[in-house]
From Swiss-Prot:
Residues annotated as binding ATP: L43, R44, G85, K88, T89, T90, E151, D152, F153, R194, Y204, R241
Native source species: Corynebacterium efficiens (strain DSM 44549 / YS-314 / AJ 12310 / JCM 11189 / NBRC 100395)
Residue ranges of the region described as Small ATPAse domain (RuvB-S): 205-275
E.C. number: 3.6.4.-
Protein name, as recorded: Holliday junction branch migration complex subunit RuvB
Function: The RuvA-RuvB-RuvC complex processes Holliday junction (HJ) DNA during genetic recombination and DNA repair, while the RuvA-RuvB complex plays an important role in the rescue of blocked DNA replication forks via replication fork reversal (RFR). RuvA specifically binds to HJ cruciform DNA, conferring on it an open structure. The RuvB hexamer acts as an ATP-dependent pump, pulling dsDNA into and through the RuvAB complex. RuvB forms 2 homohexamers on either side of HJ DNA bound by 1 or 2 RuvA tetramers; 4 subunits per hexamer contact DNA at a time.
Localization of this protein: Cytoplasm
Gene name tied to this protein: ruvB
Amino acid sequence: MERTEFEIPGGIPPRRHGGTGRDPDTSVDANIQPDDVEAEVTLRPRSLDEFIGQPKVRDQLSLVLTGAKKRGVVPDHVLLSGPPGLGKTTMAMIIAQELGTSLRMTSGPALERAGDLAAMLSNLMEGDVLFIDEIHRIARPAEEMLYMAMEDFRIDVIVGKGPGATSIPLEIPPFTLVGATTRSGMLTGPLRDRFGFTAQMEFYDVADLTRVVKRTARILEVGIDADAAVEIASRSRGTPRIANRLLRRVRDFAEVHADGHITLGAANAALIVFDVDELGLDRLDRAVLDALVRGHGGGPVGVNTLAVAVGEEPATVEEVCEPYLVRAGMIARTGRGRVATAAAWRHLGLEPPEGTIGDY
């Protein structure tokens, strides 16, 4: 794609490697602004028809919800899997909206004891949607209580301690559980089997991400050229959350250094300022590649070693960086550890050694 030059007052800041302190549930790190969380809520689609991308999941989910409404019953429990930022939380909100019911939200780490889950379940109304994010991190006592709740719509509450403890059955109204996970392999078999519908959220292609960028620009009332929307989409790592975040940062740049309208030149210049390269890799991604290639000769290297090298938590490297780097053909996961491909070497401006994966 042709690059348009755009002068940046004060010059372009140098790229730096190192830790970013990113949370595994966020993607383009250091450029998160205080109003971003509120903005993401505002930008969420409110129906399956508004939801862009994931056509297979949308069609399947539409059948599940429509069939349940026609029968007058609550839909089967839903499990949504996939990397962060692909719309799992949004899809849970849409399910509640499509059913015309309330959405109750919590997360796996918040359910440390069975009592935490019992309190939430006892407050549900008939037909409510209960959304548990990071459901793979739910504590075992709460998970075991969830089995009965999902299957029989009742729980057993233990009153007292020791030999005098008694179990009191508590009926709960029929509800639909929507679980979201970035690590479906960490779910136990009994929990996974209780979901009637499971869906894998896939990375977006550039065409769908361009539609996301244009829709967001309309909502934010920002003018944007078509080629600028494509450029932002192509650097968004296949992830709508990143596309929206990059658009807001490009908007900031255009308002400060131009007339507020986003051109291709403004988009390119802004993305350089915010350290996002042509493939959508940011500082942490390049730090991982640099540690793997320059620090360990291309690998194989374990994820814990890589995390120490870049100053991040292993979960951040594994859940945020790796999915896209593997998809982009930069890293191969082997039984002995992570290995840099020829594409990773060349992306860093280095010639890959003979025999490197992907060097044809």
